[in-house]
């Protein structure tokens, strides 16, 4: 067997070994995703990964967020969900509004409007800081949905690879 073939096979083996070590070190949740969700009503806590989420209230029909001089306007209407998030795990975790999904009764999915979220939260760094175990944050998640539409449920995640938890929203 030529030397370059032997070297290529060895390099491939090292890459595979590195991937296996990374999978063990990082954890299997990075490479897998299940579809089973915990489901609760608004106001009840629900866990996904290291986070315990409690959606306390939702207000829709908002057409401006911010101050009179510095504001965001929606394409349709803003729906703002107030939520408490507790890190109930054993390691720090970062909250990201971009992975918190909302659905209307027909199953249409909406993503959070992060720029509007900066205006809605008194501490915009809430999106950038790690939440240590035992600590909590309170956030306002902002969705820009069509006028006349409603949010039926939220799908909440600690990170993009967790299974998610469902919160049914009142109509």
Could you say what each language-model-derived stretch is?
Residues 1-171:
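Conserved functional micro-motifs across diverse proteins
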């Amino acid at each position: 067997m030529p030397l370059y073939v032997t070297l290529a096979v060895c390099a491939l083996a090292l890459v595979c070994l590195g991937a296996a070590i990374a999978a063990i070190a990082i954890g299997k949740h990075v490479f897998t995703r299940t579809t089973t969700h915990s489901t609760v009503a608004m106001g009840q806590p629900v866990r996904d990964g290291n986070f315990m989420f409690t959606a306390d209230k939702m207000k829709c029909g908002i057409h401006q967020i911010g101050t009179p001089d510095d504001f965001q306007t929606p394409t349709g209407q803003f729906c703002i969900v107030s939520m408490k998030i507790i890190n109930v795990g054993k390691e720090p975790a970062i909250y990201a509004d971009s992975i918190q999904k909302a659905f209307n009764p027909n199953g249409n999915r909406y993503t959070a409007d992060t720029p509007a979220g900066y205006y809605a939260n008194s501490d915009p760094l809430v999106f950038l800081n790690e939440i240590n175990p035992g600590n909590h944050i309170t956030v306002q998640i902002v969705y820009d949905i069509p006028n006349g539409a409603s949010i039926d449920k939220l799908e909440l995640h600690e990170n993009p690879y967790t299974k998610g938890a469902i919160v049914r929203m009142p109509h």
